[in-house]
């Protein structure tokens, strides 16, 4: 009886040892698995699919050239794409018909032109939720002359931006299109240069976000709308730090051009304060557009001036 025990143990262990490892990237609709994110993306072609991503740290990137794709972490926050970019741009270069990114972390993106991003959106609508963009030159970057709709929700942007690695600055979020950008319930902190949010779009919704610049370094504005915009900026909290490259305004409208109307842009129910030890007196809203902005009641801490026309 004693001599049979090792054989029994081996018989029980062998099937488990021989079980195949499931590929980390799976098409939800078909169950087909892939070893790389790009192979999964290319399999979709012009179709519609959800790519489920297993927990792990991936030194991979992908270019979506067509179709409608949802990139979804099986467990939110457990999937990290780190340090690898495609086309010298970003971990995810998106130019399909539409994209959703859900629960994914992007970290350590750097490229030669200073614009290394987690996501580069070039064509198609984009939704980002439950994502993190960390310690990179840029978080989300994109520009296309179309009525693109971009939605960013419940996401974190930290350790992003630069103005000393290229001619033009990089920012936590920098988007340009002829449609709209919505940013909700997200956190911005520890910027390393540029603006936290820079948008060249006609319509914006920026609500219920937290901008904590206390540990920022060489940062500029919290929100820059350089060509004007209409929409809503409300219920955000802002804390401006001491190590600013440009400390003169929290929200700046129309500093470069009057491409888009700004009349009626509503800015209300926000809370803006200075970090301890900051003695300079910035404007909460600095307006170059000369349009009749709809500025409601905002809670402003000591030293923050409500409005300035430039």
Question: What are these model-derived regions, one by one?
Answer:
Residues 2-7:
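Sec-dependent signal peptide recognition
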Residues 19-22, 42-47, 63-65, 94-95, ...:
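Flexible, charged surface loops at secondary-structure boundaries
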Residues 21-59:
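Acidic Gly/Asp/Thr-rich repetitive segments characteristic of extracellular carbohydrate-active
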Residues 28-35, 50-52, 62, 66-114:
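Right-handed parallel beta-helix/beta-spiral solenoid domain characteristic of secreted/periplasmic
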Residues 38, 83-93, 112-120, 135-144, ...:
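Extracellular beta-strand/beta-solenoid scaffold signature
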Residues 54-55, 68, 72-80, 97-108, ...:
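Right-handed parallel beta-helix
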Residues 279-310:
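Leucine-rich solenoid repeat scaffolds
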């Amino acid at each position: 009886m004693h001599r049979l025990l090792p054989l029994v143990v081996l018989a029980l262990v062998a099937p488990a040892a021989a079980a195949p490892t499931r590929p980390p990237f799976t098409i939800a609709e078909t169950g087909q698995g892939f070893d790389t994110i790009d192979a999964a993306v290319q399999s979709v072609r012009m179709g519609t699919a959800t790519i489920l991503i297993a927990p792990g740290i991936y030194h991979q990137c992908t270019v979506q050239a067509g179709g409608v794709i949802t990139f979804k972490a099986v467990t939110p926050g457990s999937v990290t794409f780190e340090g690898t970019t495609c086309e010298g741009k970003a971990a995810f270069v998106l130019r399909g018909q539409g994209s959703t990114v859900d629960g994914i972390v992007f970290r350590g993106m750097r490229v030669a032109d200073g614009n290394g991003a987690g996501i580069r959106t070039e064509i198609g609508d984009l939704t980002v939720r439950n994502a993190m963009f960390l310690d990179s030159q840029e978080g989300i970057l994109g520009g296309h002359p179309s009525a693109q709709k971009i939605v960013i929700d419940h996401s974190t942007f930290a350790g992003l931006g630069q103005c000393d690695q290229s001619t033009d600055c990089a920012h936590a979020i920098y988007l340009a299109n002829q449609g709209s950008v919505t940013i909700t319930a997200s956190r911005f902190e520890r910027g390393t240069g540029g603006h936290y949010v820079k948008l060249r779009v006609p319509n914006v919704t920026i609500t219920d976000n937290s901008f904590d610049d206390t540990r920022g370094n060489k940062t500029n504005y919290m929100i820059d709308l350089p060509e004007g915009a209409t929409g809503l900026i409300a219920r955000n909290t802002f804390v401006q730090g001491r190590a600013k490259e440009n400390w003169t305004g929290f929200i700046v409208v129309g500093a470069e051009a009057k491409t888009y109307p700004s009349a009626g842009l509503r800015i209300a129910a926000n809370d803006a304060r200075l970090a301890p030890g900051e003695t300079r007196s910035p404007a909460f809203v600095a307006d170059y557009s000369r349009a009749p902005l709809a500025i409601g009641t905002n809670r402003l801490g000591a030293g923050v001036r409500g409005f300035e026309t430039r």
